[in-house]
């Protein structure tokens, strides 16, 4: 079979998608207001980079393509400013975090687009249960073969990404005792988990065309893999991260993945084999459950190693690529977080323990979401 087209991208160019919670300013619960928000944004600058998600209490911002994490950060701040200005006119707020701590998925409303209606008819309750919030990171690849190699090679590091981004310890009003409860939600979807062990772009093209011919998929979006190729963009898309509490944290995560991807593409240090996936689900569970304090089974070692230690060693290993990309400032901050066992899940638990109030927790998350910005006038603190 002929090859699928793959749009050539600059090596490790970056883009990101961030899904945020739409919050009612009085009750601090999720509120289904994305239709109103999209109408209010109609004539705004960057309108095409702010999009609805499958349920109406979600909103997504998309960066454009960047080589520099700093430039991406500047753009995200501009997008945030537009959201804040628009929110003031319709009395809503936004926050990060992979889950809302006390929302009930049964109360969510599907956004009335043709695509989302079709997905709801196909997946029913799973669609509403997917009212969770993630950061997706795109990494540019020059060729389809590079994309397939990187998709597999980064699978070794998925526990890193889950652990450093974890921000969803509470779900449906309970403490799940997971650092990232969000990362368990999509397991029920078909075509979730990991890409099959396809070794090059030709094998992937053959697989894709068979799945299309069998009417299992219509396009690449029907694959819910943790990491998937995006040939129409010339990228791979990492989909395992919780939405961080701050825009800056999203940049730290992106900067780390960008440098790691460059290291892997340049040095081909991960040897692809089925062994990568023998341990994948267990390692993923360790990161979801325990975060930075989880353990990682590496196939060339005799015993598990702490995820935290593996991240710190990896940062040292890829230092020249971090420096070359100009990401040192962000990685130094990430290194400090990791060595001190700090992620957003730890912070959320700490805030909740102060008052035992989910409403005050959400209010704090809304404030943290604005910590990159000086504009805090929209929020009325709950009594």
Curated annotation (Swiss-Prot):
Recorded GO terms, molecular function? ATP binding; glutamate-cysteine ligase activity
Q: Which Pfam families match?
A: GCS2 (PF04107)
Reaction equation(s) it catalyzes: L-cysteine + L-glutamate + ATP = gamma-L-glutamyl-L-cysteine + ADP + phosphate + H(+)
Q: Which domain of life is it from?
A: Bacteria
Q: What Gene3D superfamilies has UniProt attached to this entry?
A: 3.30.590.20
Q: Which UniProt keywords apply?
A: ATP-binding, Ligase, Nucleotide-binding
Enzyme nomenclature, EC number? 6.3.2.2
**Any GO BP:** modified amino acid biosynthetic process
Q: Which InterPro entries match?
A: GCL_type2/YbdK_subfam (IPR050141), GCS2 (IPR006336), Gln_synth/guanido_kin_cat_dom (IPR014746), YbdK (IPR011793)
Q: Which family does it belong to?
A: Belongs to the glutamate--cysteine ligase type 2 family. YbdK subfamily.
The record's annotation in HAMAP family points to: Glu_cys_ligase_2
Question: What name does UniProt use for this protein?
Answer: Putative glutamate--cysteine ligase 2
Q: Which organism is it from?
A: Legionella pneumophila subsp. pneumophila (strain Philadelphia 1 / ATCC 33152 / DSM 7513)
């Amino acid at each position: 079979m002929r090859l699928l087209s793959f749009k050539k991208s600059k090596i490790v160019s970056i883009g990101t998608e961030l899904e945020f919670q739409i919050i009612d300013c009085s009750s601090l619960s999720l509120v289904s207001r994305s239709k109103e928000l999209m109408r209010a944004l109609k004539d705004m600058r960057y309108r095409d980079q702010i999009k609805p998600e499958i349920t109406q209490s979600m909103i997504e911002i998309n960066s454009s393509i960047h080589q520099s994490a700093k430039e991406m950060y500047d753009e995200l701040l501009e997008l945030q400013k537009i959201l804040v200005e628009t929110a003031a006119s319709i009395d809503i707020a936004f926050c990060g975090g992979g889950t809302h701590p006390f929302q009930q998925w049964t109360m969510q409303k599907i956004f009335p687009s043709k695509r989302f209606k079709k997905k709801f008819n196909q997946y029913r309750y799973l669609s509403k249960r997917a009212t969770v919030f993630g950061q997706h990171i795109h990494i540019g690849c020059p060729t389809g073969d590079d994309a397939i190699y990187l998709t597999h090679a980064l699978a070794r590091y998925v526990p890193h990404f889950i652990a450093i981004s974890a921000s969803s310890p509470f779900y449906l009003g309970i403490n799940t005792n997971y650092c990232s409860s969000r990362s368990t939600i999509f397991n029920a979807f078909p075509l979730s988990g990991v890409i099959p062990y396809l070794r090059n772009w030709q094998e992937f093209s053959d697989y894709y065309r068979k799945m299309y011919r069998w009417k299992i998929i219509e396009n690449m979006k029907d694959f819910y893999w943790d990491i998937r190729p995006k040939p129409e963009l010339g990228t791979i898309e990492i989909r395992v991260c919780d939405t961080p509490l701050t825009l800056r944290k999203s940049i730290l995560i992106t900067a780390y993945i960008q440098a790691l991807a460059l290291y892997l593409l340049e040095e081909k240090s991960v040897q692809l084999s089925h062994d990568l996936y023998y341990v994948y689900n267990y390692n993923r569970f360790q990161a979801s459950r325990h975060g930075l304090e989880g353990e990682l089974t590496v196939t060339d070692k005799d015993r598990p190693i702490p995820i935290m230690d593996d991240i710190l060693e990896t940062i040292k290993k890829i230092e020249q690529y971090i420096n070359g990309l100009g990401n040192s400032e962000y990685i130094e901050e990430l290194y400090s977080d990791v060595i001190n066992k700090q992620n957003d899940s730890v912070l959320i638990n700490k805030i909740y323990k102060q008052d035992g109030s989910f409403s005050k927790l959400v209010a704090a998350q809304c404030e943290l979401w604005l910590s990159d910005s000086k504009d805090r006038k929209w929020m009325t603190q709950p009594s």
